[in-house]
Amino acid sequence: MWQRVKDSQKLDVNSTYCYIMLSEYFTDTCLVAEIDKEIVGFVTSLIRPSNPEVLFVWQIAVSTEYQGKGIAYSLLRDLITGASCTQVRYIETTISPNNAASNRLFRKFAVEIDAPLLESEGFSSHLFPGDIHEDERLIQIGPINHKFGGINS
């Protein structure tokens, strides 16, 4: 996962330890896509402890050579239709304006499941170290009807 993030050149690279911890302790809400035993994509997320109806998607990435093949969309769909997300009514994530791929992915997902997408202030750039980080916009999709829009859980 760490390598996929590093290769993306769009996502914030966290420590390898962080990705190991996510894989170990959030297995219900973190998925990988493998081809020939190589991780070609992943999604990390968690259900908000303060609101179990909200799934926060932290990062989603796909290897450059596999982008545009629907892997990120499939990961997101598999995640939201999984057993651990049956109570989830909203998906939230933060995206920087220059991350066109993530912006397209979440907008497409909202349309496909026929759920509203709201955009609001997320995390201001001044919260991040250095001068190179953009503001992160908060994206919220929902409410999600698991029996509507093609999602069957």
Predicted region positions:
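A short helix-loop-beta-strand connector motif used in the catalytic cores of GNAT acetyltransferases and
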Residues: 21-32, 53
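Conserved acetyl-CoA-binding loop-helix of GNAT-fold acetyltransferases
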Residues: 62, 68-82, 104, 108
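A conserved beta-turn-beta hairpin within the catalytic core of GNAT-like acetyltransferases
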Residues: 48-57, 67, 86-87
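A short, internal acetyl-CoA/4′-phosphopantetheine-binding micro-motif in the GNAT/acyltransferase core
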Residues: 59-67, 95-96
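Conserved beta-strand in the GNAT
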Residues: 32, 38-47, 54-56, 61
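Short amphipathic alpha-helix that is part of the acyltransferase structural core
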Residues: 1-14, 34, 152
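Conserved active-site alpha-helix within GNAT-family acetyltransferase domains
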Residues: 73, 97-121
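Conserved GNAT acetyl-CoA-binding A-motif
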Residues: 83-97, 105
